Amino acid sequence: MCQLSLIGLAFKLYDPDHLIGEREDIGITVALVPTDLPGVEIGRRHLPALQAFQNGPTRGRDVFIPVDNVIGGVAQVGQGWKMLMSALAAGRGISLPSLSAAGAAVAAHTTGAYARIREQFHQPIGRFPAIQERLGRMAATVYLLDAARRLTCAGIDHGHKPAVITAVMKEQATERLRVVVNDAMDVHGGKGVQDGPHNYLGTSYRSVPIGITVEGANIVTRSLIQFGQGAIRSHPYLLKEMTALEDPDRARRALVTLCATWAQKSRSNASSPRARSGSSSAVISLSR
C-alpha cells in the first residue's frame, strides 16, 4: 500500500515568546509536514460509504516543524486562510461540480431509459404523471448544472479565483445531485436498492454524502462562506474597514475616511427618489 510522505497541515499559530515578531496570535498558517518526523502517526485508511475514496486519520504529538516548512516562510505566517480558500477554489469550482453534473446526467439518462422499458398496467411507467414529474425535474437540473459548471470553469480558466462563487457552486451542485439521485432511486423502485453488478445507481446513491461533506461540509459552507464571506465581499466598505484594522499605524485615519464615505453614501441613498417612494409606501402600509 502506498504510504504518504508529506502532509499539508493548517493550524492556528501562536508566538508567545515573540520569536518571529511582535504579535502573539498570528493566525491560521499552512505548513508541509514530512510523515517521517518524530511524533507523526499515519493511521489505517478508512472506507467512506464503501467507496474507494482515500481518507484516514493522521495524528501528531510533540511534533517539531521547522519554520522553513511553512509555505512562503516567515513572511507568509498567518496567511493560511487565503491559501486554503485559493486551493479549495479549484476543487469547489471544477472537480465536485463536474462530478455532480456528470452523475446527474448519468442518473437522468438511465432513469429515462428505464421508465421507457419498464411496464406496469400494460404501459411504460414513463407515461405516469408522477414519473414524468421526476423525469422533468431531473432533466432540468442536468441542464442547470452543466450551464453553471461551464460558467464557473470559464472564470477559473481566465485566472480568477472566485472563492464565494466556487463555494456556492460546490454546495448547490452536490445538493442538487442528491435530489437527482433520489429521484432516480424513486423511479427505479426495488431495482435501485438491490445490490449487485447490474445495479448502476447504488454506488452513486452511497457516494453522494461524500461530495456533500468534503471540501467543506455544505452546512458550514453555506453559512460561513456564502453568507459570511459573501456579505463581506459584496459590501463596498466593510472589507476595507476590516483590512484597515489589521494595520495599527493607518487604522484610525483609514477608518475615519471609510466611515465618512459610508455615511455620505447612506445619506445619498436615503435622499434618492426611490428611497423616498419606498418610505412613503411603507408609511401608507403601516397606517392601514
State each model region's role.
Residues R59-R92, H109-G126, R150, S268, ...:
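A glycine-rich, basic-preceded beta-loop-alpha segment at the flavin cofactor/substrate interface
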